[in-house]
Amino acid sequence: MERNRDRRERDNQPKEFVEKLIKLNAVSKTVKGGRRRSFSALVVVGDQKGRVGYGMGKANDVSYAIRKATETAKKNLITVNVKDSTIPHEVMGNFKSACVLLKPASAGTGVIAGGAVRAVCDAVGIKDILSKSLGSKNTINTVKATLDGLENLFSAKKLSEDRGKSLKDIWG
């Protein structure tokens, strides 16, 4: 009885992070007795306030694979500079042969992005963005390229300090 109460209390608490399952892959290994099935999961987590991370997990059970991936993602969080509901400037993210072009969009445009890029943008908290995936369509590499692009964003404050200008001169 005590354990069930603890579980209910834990489930009723508001979650700190939004978890998005991007890819679940069932793989099988042939052994002497037949085929052994295992699962691989790719998960993106974010707080919708500018922090995001991704993780991969492998296990013999789907739920364990997702749990492992979520824990790994929470350990690999990065902070992204978000201006209002979009990104401050255009950026290109690369990982291996996957390239992702991210462009800021005016308010009300929405997230114009494909599967993996959309999940990352939702987890970060970006509401308006335009994107184009170029090169490889591999899901894992696309997620890594998207995060590379988001990591390379300049903050308005840092840009104004580097150029020796005020914030109003740069962003208008």
Task: Put a short name on every predicted segment.
Residues 1-172:
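Ribosome-associated RNA-binding proteins
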